[in-house]
Every structure is written in C-alpha cells, then in structure tokens.
Amino acid sequence: MAVTMADITKLRKMTGAGMMDCKNALTEAEGDYDKAMEIIRKKGQAVAAKRSERDASEGCVLAKTTGDYAVVIALKCETDFVAQNADFVKLTQDILDLAVANKCKTLDEVKALPMGNGTVQDAVVDRSGITGEKMELDGYMTVEGTSTAVYNHMNRNGLCTIVAFNKNVDDQLAKQVAMQIAAMNPIAIDEDGVSEEVKEKEIAVAIEKTKAEQVQKAVEAALKKANINPAHVDSEEHMESNMAKGWITAEDIAKAKEIIATVSAEKAAHLPEQMIQNIAKGRLGKFLKEVCLLNQEDIMDAKKTVREVLAAADPELKVLDFKRFTLKAE
C-alpha cells in the first residue's frame, strides 16, 4: 500500500523517530503501525547502542509529592524534539509514579522496578530504540518530612525542586520556598550545611582577591602620582596600542613598568594581615548569605530573608531538606 504523508506524520508523533525512518518502516510494514513501531524500535536500539558516548543533555525532569515524601527524577535524551514527545513525557511520569509508590532509595532501585514485560531500564532502552537517541535516567533524589512540596519551573520539565518541612505548611508558602530553591539555587539550608572544605576554599579565594585589590590600589595611586593614566598601562597590549595613538610615550611605558614592579612587590610585602582577614571574612559572610537558603533574600519580598518569612508563618517551622535538579549547566 502507498504510504501517505499523514501516515508518516502520525507515526512520527507516536515515536519521535525521523521522517525517513517512519516512511521506511511503514513501507516495510505495509502500513501496519504496530509492525512499523517494532521495526523502528529494533533499528533504533542498534543506533542508540552506537550513540552510548553521545551527550544526552535534553530530557524531561518531573517531581511528585505524596505529602510526607517527595521525589524528583529525569529521563534524558539528545534532542528537545524527543524530550517534548508525549510518549517520552508519559514514560518519565510512569517511572516517577513507580518510584514514589515503591519509595525507592536509589536510582538503581528505580531501574530494577518491574515495568511492562521487563524492568524500568528495559522500558528506557525500548524508548531509546524507537527514537534512535541515547537515553538515560538521572537526577533521582528524595526528601521526607511531615510535609513536602514540589515545583516544576514554568511547567517546562527542565528544572524541578523538592523540599521537606518539619510541620504542615500552607500550600502557597511551601510552593514559594520550592520556587526560591529553583530561582536562587542554594547549596545548603544554613551555614551548618556548608562543608568546612567549601568555607576554607572560599576564604582562601577571598584572601587572595583582597590582597590583589590592595596591591592594585597602591599601584594605581603611584601611577596617578606620576601623571600616568593606569588604564593606559594595564596590559602590554594597551601599552602598545596607546603608544601608537600617541597617548603615552616609550618613556612613560618604561616608567610605568618600573612603578608597577616596585610598588607591587613593596605593597605585597607589607599588607596589613588583620585588615585582609576582616575583608575576607566579610566576603565569606556574603557568600554564605547567597548560598544558604535561610539567609537568602526572599524572592517575593527582598526586604526579608527566607528565615524571616518562615518565622513569621510559624516560629517552629523548619526546612528539613531540599533537592534541585536541572538539565541546563549553570
């Protein structure tokens, strides 16, 4: 039988496979959709196996709560077209539902769950075979508490958060906290949740940055005193181009280089240690305010912190845990 464009389009919507793959499969299957899907699946599995090293950076991220338990999971693929396919999204939702129902602790447990005639992992391989794209499960995380909330950013299935509380929470407030986590990407609930390794790294970076700034200030002051514009001599490239423009002379450049070398060494050798430490600690404090959920400015009211918003709702209300997963690099 003749294969029409309508037939090809229908199969493409059903499978997410390419137009030519759909046409060839329908031709081979003589118009039988079930047979065509099986042909695409087998061909796709072979193609997908060859794509195992490819980057699956698109996909579908979903989250679900049962009240005291919440889960987030991602099914990843190669293209946005496949990620938005209804069957692909449904498969992600079905896997999520199974994971929640079984309260799986790990991704391996999820993959081993019975699904259809095989396991969840088998179902993912089958879908990979249909589309010919690499697919993999990722981002499986859970939280538990007296109450939990989830947030799917703009309902686009690309970024989801889950959060657990020690008490029952107003739905709007719970969603607001989940949105806060999505928008501001905290790494911990409060300072106690930030590892000493991270704090030590940040303070070390802050110290070096502060020292460099103090040296730079001294150099710029010395250059200005010598009637040399610091912006004209801040790099070898600028020195050459500015001399070509007639803004500075070769003598200015020689003098500037001498000042930069001498003042830099002198200032670096006599930096006030206590001042450096104080500035660095201030920068660490700013860092902790930015990365700790409770310290962050509330996205709905920048005059308050998340801690203050929660305390206003209930002084005993606490965030127990949260998780965040996104497909996009940040």
From Swiss-Prot:
Region of interest (Involved in Mg(2+) ion dislocation from EF-Tu), ranges: 79-82
Protein localization: Cytoplasm
Xref: InterPro entries: EF-Ts_dimer_sf (IPR036402), Transl_elong_EFTs/EF1B (IPR001816), Transl_elong_EFTs/EF1B_dimer (IPR014039), Transl_elong_Ts_CS (IPR018101), UBA-like_sf (IPR009060)
GO biological processes: translational elongation
Keyword set, alphabetical order: Cytoplasm, Elongation factor, Protein biosynthesis
Gene Ontology MF annotations: translation elongation factor activity
Gene Ontology cellular component annotations, sorted alphabetically: cytoplasm
Main location: cytoplasm
HAMAP family: EF_Ts (MF_00050)
Annotated function: Associates with the EF-Tu.GDP complex and induces the exchange of GDP to GTP. It remains bound to the aminoacyl-tRNA.EF-Tu.GTP complex up to the GTP hydrolysis stage on the ribosome.
Family: Belongs to the EF-Ts family.
NCBIfam families (UniProt xref): tsf
Protein name: Elongation factor Ts
